[in-house]
Every structure is written in structure tokens, then in C-alpha cells.
């Protein structure tokens, strides 16, 4: 999980989700997991 100021989709399978007021990227590739901090 990377915590970044700006999250973006890295590949086609990345999905942007809003959870508890935070924007999260989930993907089949675990390296692409991101959270906005």
C-alpha cells in the first residue's frame, strides 16, 4: 500500500474507490494499491 498525495490508476484493472472519506486504488496487481493521505 502506497500512501500518496495524488492517487491515479496505473493500469486498466485499477479501480478508484472512496472509503471512509479516503480515495483508494485497488487492483489485481498488489503493487498498484494506493491510498490518499
Curated annotation (Swiss-Prot):
GO terms for molecular function: structural constituent of ribosome. Pfam families: Ribosomal_L36 (PF00444). One of its GO terms (cellular component) is chloroplast. It comes from Nymphaea alba. Belongs to the bacterial ribosomal protein bL36 family. Disulfide bonds: none annotated. Keywords: Chloroplast, Plastid, Ribonucleoprotein, Ribosomal protein. Its main location: plastid. The gene is rpl36. InterPro entries: Ribosomal_bL36, Ribosomal_bL36_sp. It is found in: Plastid, Chloroplast. HAMAP family: Ribosomal_bL36. Transmembrane segments: none annotated. It comes from the Eukaryota. One of its GO terms (biological process) is translation. This is Large ribosomal subunit protein bL36c.
Amino acid at each position: 500500500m502506497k500512501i500518496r498525495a495524488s492517487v491515479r490508476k496505473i493500469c486498466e484493472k485499477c479501480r478508484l474507490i472512496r472509503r471512509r472519506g479516503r480515495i483508494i486504488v485497488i487492483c489485481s496487481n498488489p503493487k498498484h494499491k494506493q491510498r490518499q493521505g
